[in-house]
Amino acid sequence: MSLFDWFADRRKGQFVGKVTQESEESDGLWEKCPECGQVVYRKDLIDNCSVCSNCGHHNRIDSKERIRLISDPNTFKSINNHLTPVDPLGFKDRRAYADRLRESQAGTGLKDGVLTGTCEVNSIPMALAVMDFRFMGGSMGSVVGEKITRLIEHSTKEKLPLLIVCASGGARMQEGMLSLMQMAKISGALERHRDAQLLYMPLLTHPTTGGVTASFAMLGDLILAEPKALIGFAGRRVIEQTLREKLPDNFQTAEYLQDHGFVDTIVPRTELKETLAKILRLHKTQVVKLQTNA
């Protein structure tokens, strides 16, 4: 519902009671699309998976909302979400790393930047990890890496397909080499998952960059992406300065990567659950056929 439609409904008497502009703004009734500028009724935006109905812009959502959109109701069971990051290097730049952790934990209600667990998608069981960009830019530290690795190992043991929703600025610099080690650790766990002939799908959302892109985000059997998501390793400006060339306007977008074979399919958020269910059903059918033929 647009702002114009909302006022039209008020004139028809569908909304009762006096609501001031100040109370509307304070209650957060409206959202302005950062892409097209359309003012949208917040409830309608949420009902549409936080996708702008006017231009299709995918607004950023948190990990809990992502889980709600993907999984069947009340089927998500968390795994290893008790793990909490520490400050192994006593790192301090403009602020102490320990202070940044406390601030992110208070602001998000999470212990670190990823939620992991199992769920069902249209009654099909699946392992699920969802990164949360609100927590220090979704950066991958030792706890994020450990939780994802343990989830992969659990899905291998239980013979579950795996989906990792990526939203990250890359490795967490405040943990130095410990964060970079997670790239190899997760990649090794994924190789064992693949050896067990199990399905792994990364979903690349805006943004997916740095060490996450250079490791598990690009190791899927089927690589999914949201429309217009920023996907890359180094930043655009860094690449242009290094190459001394002007890059295409759509460089490092999901569409550009699909055109060049790095992304298999782009899935609008409103179609994600049904798309996942179709893929999972097809994979389950093929596994049964292989086992029968064996």
Curated annotation (Swiss-Prot):
Q: Which reaction does it catalyse?
A: N(6)-carboxybiotinyl-L-lysyl-[protein] + acetyl-CoA = N(6)-biotinyl-L-lysyl-[protein] + malonyl-CoA
Listed HAMAP family: AcetylCoA_CT_beta (MF_01395)
| Cofactor(s) required, per the database record | Zn(2+)
Please share the entry's free-text remark on the cofactor.
Binds 1 zinc ion per subunit.
Q: How does it assemble?
A: Acetyl-CoA carboxylase is a heterohexamer composed of biotin carboxyl carrier protein (AccB), biotin carboxylase (AccC) and two subunits each of ACCase subunit alpha (AccA) and ACCase subunit beta (AccD).
- Could you tell me the EC number(s) of this protein? 2.1.3.15
The CoA carboxyltransferase N-terminal domain, residue ranges:
29-294
Name the record gives this protein: Acetyl-coenzyme A carboxylase carboxyl transferase subunit beta
**InterPro entries on file:** AcCoA_carboxyl_beta, Acetyl_CoA_COase_Trfase_b_su, ClpP/crotonase-like_dom_sf, COA_CT_N, Znf-ACC
GO cellular component, alphabetical, reads: acetyl-CoA carboxylase complex
Give the keywords, sorted.
Answer: ATP-binding, Cytoplasm, Fatty acid biosynthesis, Fatty acid metabolism, Lipid biosynthesis, Lipid metabolism, Metal-binding, Nucleotide-binding, Transferase, Zinc, Zinc-finger
**Which residues are listed for Zn(2+) binding in this entry?**
33, 36, 52, 55
What's an example GO BP annotation here?
fatty acid biosynthetic process
Query: What family is reported?
Result: Belongs to the AccD/PCCB family.
Q: Pathway, according to UniProt?
A: Lipid metabolism; malonyl-CoA biosynthesis; malonyl-CoA from acetyl-CoA: step 1/1
Subcellular location per the Swiss-Prot or TrEMBL entry? Cytoplasm
Principal subcellular localisation of the protein: cytoplasm
This chain's function reads:
Component of the acetyl coenzyme A carboxylase (ACC) complex. Biotin carboxylase (BC) catalyzes the carboxylation of biotin on its carrier protein (BCCP) and then the CO(2) group is transferred by the transcarboxylase to acetyl-CoA to form malonyl-CoA.
